[in-house]
């Protein structure tokens, strides 16, 4: 049955772990720390960006260029989950590595197009309504962000190998080293007078490539073990047409698995752009966008950490029908993460981080504190959603995940449109839309799993 996935997979190898709170926590905490430290890089370089000549508005332009970069990169967003499901043998690993390279090359080329004439003016000045000086910052951030996005794709392969060997601690160590380098640059560059969006991008890119090299180094022995045990020949002669066909079919199988997940990731990545379009049409739009970006910069690391429950769900699927132990674990973990997020509502921390570090004006600080308070429930919603999406991945039903992610964008834009019509303040619009969309996503994935399960039984 689908719920007894931990014993043996379809190729006969043991690839799932038995549930216990201690074992799950030892696997999840490094993932949580990795996600948190990975996402905290952006608030760090926010200090470099906001101290440039454009102040906090420079962060708005920088964030919009990065948003488009991540939206394009998200078309490969299903690759990590694909690797965790399919890259558990030597042949599967090599097929995954080839697929990852093909998608990286195609998407990096695609990333350059909106940053070049004539599309750049249509995107930044037209759709996003950015003034010329901010449009120029967003354009250059997107164009030179090609190097940063490349590091993410390159990291996919060794990171998947570590996750599949339950070595999330080593993946976390690489990310911690990345955050330390980014922190060092965030301190050093402003002291050298190197501030503004361009230097913020330099700090991010340097840390990302450093993380890739460390992750690759940690994964080397596990890759060697995979290669020595592979069952499907890869480096065979050109005359071996059967082997070539089998290699092609493996890549094609993984591509078919990753496309629905990646399309869904693209839909999710498009959501910040949708928020920017709606909030940009509210009263005092520049202030509202700035508040949105500085507060989502705090909420995203914790929300992303909660979403890592997807990987935990793949490693620890249900052992029997009605097994809800991981669901309860996800709820508890999300509640703890939400409590940590609420620390940014306290006056002392809020005044320092938003007022001093991110240069938010004193009269706008209560907006930032209010937004963070409204995000308090979001980590729990994210963790529950991630648990259900992980089950869909284990059952090799990426269409269920995609259904949820389509629902996310529909719910997000619908909520934004309604709140804009009602005259809701810009920063409240974004938080309400994100929370509502997350709930709708969870319901949609769960419903899709139920429907697809019934079809399989027929």
Regions found by a protein language model. Give the residues of each.
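Interhelical loop/hinge segments that connect adjacent transmembrane helices in multipass membrane
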Residues: 2-29, 134-136, 197-205, 213-269, ...
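Helix-terminus/linker motif at the lipid-water interface of multi-pass membrane proteins
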Residues: 3, 39-60, 125-129, 190-194, ...
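Hydrophobic faces of transmembrane alpha-helices in multi-pass small-molecule transporters and flippases
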Residues: 16-40, 142, 146, 169-173, ...
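Small-residue-rich hydrophobic transmembrane alpha-helices
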Residues: 59-111, 155-164, 291-344, 385-393, ...
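Alpha-helical transmembrane segments of multi-pass membrane transporters/permeases
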Residues: 94, 161-187, 198, 319-332, ...
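Short membrane-interface helical motifs at transmembrane helix boundaries
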Residues: 109-139, 339-369
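Alpha-helical transmembrane segments of multi-pass membrane proteins
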Residues: 131-158, 298, 302, 361-388
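Hydrophobic alpha-helical transmembrane segments
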Residues: 141, 173-224, 230, 234, ...
